[in-house]
Curated annotation (Swiss-Prot):
Keywords: Iron, Isomerase, Metal-binding. Gene3D superfamilies: q2cbj1_9rhob like domain (2.60.120.620). Homodimer. It comes from Aspergillus novofumigatus (strain IBT 16806). This is Fumigatonoid B endoperoxide isomerase nvfE. The gene is nvfE. Pathway: Secondary metabolite biosynthesis; terpenoid biosynthesis. Its EC number is 5.4.99.-. Fumigatonoid B endoperoxide isomerase; part of the gene cluster that mediates the biosynthesis of novofumigatonin, a heavily oxygenated meroterpenoid containing a unique orthoester moiety. The first step of the pathway is the synthesis of 3,5-dimethylorsellinic acid (DMOA) by the polyketide synthase nvfA via condensation of one acetyl-CoA starter unit with 3 malonyl-CoA units and 2 methylations. DMOA is then converted to farnesyl-DMOA by the farnesyltransferase nvfB.
Length: 327
């Protein structure tokens, strides 16, 4: 084995091989549950939390989403069939208030993604803390016989880049997700696969093969959740079932200082922006950042202010035309 191969292997070593799995119904206090989730994610980058939401909540969220499913499609470049439903806050009040607003999720995301900064102002050292912001909401309906995704990290859209680390420190991650199972989510019908401990890996190294023995699967019942840091190597898997769609609602949050100083989207109304030349619309923020950051309903935001505008970009086209081999 050559030196580069040895280095690669070491940079993808992990001290954890199993899935941290907690049952929220067995914890006597919320703070104890939160502490154990944080401990698990610090070690493995992920944590499965059972029974975080009730069956009645899951049923209501599914009912709220259902009228929107037939008119929705998948992200461009995404394999298989089904749909990605976005903008979930306006589609389900119970999702907005009870899922996004869940206090366990709030405490976990605040731990990993709150940013504290100190600066001299007027002769005084001031301290500022910025809690995370909502990044996106996506409910994935993946139908039977749909292929899975390629392995990836979710922080690629924010250009996350880390070296290998022997232990986790807060500040390493840009974002995190909570996936709520709205149906059974299993290896057979396309649940998420991931590498425990991959949040500590070297980003300059390619991903292992999809049949690597270290891969684990987040198998969930309705109401269970899968928490994941954006530095974790993961993907959806093939839905090999014949009659079992897999439905997961993802709530993604990111560090809130990753935004413009002046809120361009409320400062100028869409009609005014529609009169701007294309270059100015893009400068204001009405354009996606590659690979695909800043979309509206899975499309270039210029389509909102000008329905005749062609999409400038989709994720699949970007990956096909900008391939690079890292040495």
């Amino acid at each position: 084995m050559g030196r580069d191969q040895v280095s690669h292997k070491r940079s993808q070593n992990s001290n954890v091989s199993e899935i941290p799995d907690l049952d929220s119904s067995l914890h006597r206090s919320e703070d104890t549950l939160v502490a154990e989730i944080i401990e698990a994610m610090t070690l493995a980058g992920v944590c499965v939390v059972r029974n975080l939401f009730t069956k009645s909540l899951v049923d209501q969220v599914l009912k709220d989403f259902e009228p929107h499913v037939s008119s929705t499609k998948l992200f461009d470049g995404y394999p298989g069939n089904g749909c990605h439903l976005t903008g979930l806050l306006s589609k389900s009040e119970i999702y907005a208030h009870m899922v996004v607003g869940n206090s366990v999720f709030e405490k976990v995301r605040n731990h990993f993604l709150s940013t504290t900064f100190r600066s001299w102002i007027g002769g005084k050292m001031m301290t500022f803390t910025s809690p995370p912001q909502l990044d996106s909401t996506i409910c994935s309906y993946i139908n039977p016989q749909s292929p899975g995704e390629h392995l990836h990290r979710d922080d690629a859209i924010h250009y996350g880049w880390n070296e290998a680390a022997s232990e986790y420190t807060v500040g390493r991650d840009i974002s995190m997700s909570m996936f709520l199972a709205l149906t059974e989510s299993t290896r057979e019908n396309g649940t998420t696969r991931f590498f425990p401990g991959s949040h500590l890996w070297d980003y300059s190294q390619d991903f292992p093969s999809a049949d690597d023995t270290r891969i684990r699967y987040a198998e969930l019942h309705p109401g269970d959740c899968y928490f994941m840091l954006s530095s974790v190597t993961h993907s959806s898997t093939d839905n090999r079932s014949t009659n079992r769609p897999r439905v997961l609602a993802a709530t993604i949050v990111t560090r809130s200082h990753l935004r413009q100083e002046e809120n361009q989207y409320l400062t100028y109304d869409p009609i005014t922006v529609g009169r701007f030349p294309t270059w100015l619309q893009r400068l204001v923020g009405y354009a996606p950042s590659a690979p695909f950051l800043g979309w509206v309903d899975k499309r270039d935001p210029r389509c909102v202010i000008d329905p005749k505008a062609a999409d400038d970009h989709c994720g699949g086209e970007y990956y096909e035309t900008n391939e690079e081999t890292l040495n």
